[in-house]
């Protein structure tokens, strides 16, 4: 993984964290982001979105999602949000899979439930374990 890719993982982690600080319900935000054109743009080899900061990216997601993000819902702790955002982006670079497919394999509830156990693991191992959990549910 190169330096730019790791920086983009950090930006996505901070984006998820920022959604919590702005009191956007976490499940609604994560689903809206991971299935958005913004996430799709970040998945591409090169896109101008990759050079935007988390504040700009959040506005893009909010504009596209509309009222979905104003519903009530739980707001996860910022460390949990950062880890989920970081790992989802890392997962994309590690496997080449698109964001929407990653979300299907590691749903939000699975990520939240496994945070305490997985956040200290090597990222690759956490991803492989999450893929295994998904495979067992099939």
Which residue ranges define each predicted feature?
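Thiolate-centered catalytic microenvironments shared by cysteine-dependent enzyme domains
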Residues: 100-103
């Amino acid at each position: 993984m190169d330096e730019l890719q790791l920086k983009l993982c950090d930006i996505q982690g901070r984006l998820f964290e920022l959604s919590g600080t702005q009191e956007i319900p976490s499940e609604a935000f994560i689903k809206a982001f991971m299935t958005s054109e913004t996430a799709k743009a970040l998945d591409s080899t090169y896109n101008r979105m990759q050079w935007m900061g988390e504040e700009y990216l959040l506005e893009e997601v909010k504009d596209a999602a509309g009222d979905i993000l104003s519903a009530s819902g739980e707001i996860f702790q910022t460390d949990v949000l950062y880890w989920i955002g970081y790992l989802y982006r890392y997962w994309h670079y590690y496997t080449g899979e698109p964001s929407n497919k990653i979300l299907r394999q590691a749903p939000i509830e699975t990520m939240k439930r496994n945070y305490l156990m997985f956040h200290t693991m090597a990222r690759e191992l956490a991803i492989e374990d999450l893929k295994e959990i998904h495979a067992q549910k099939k």
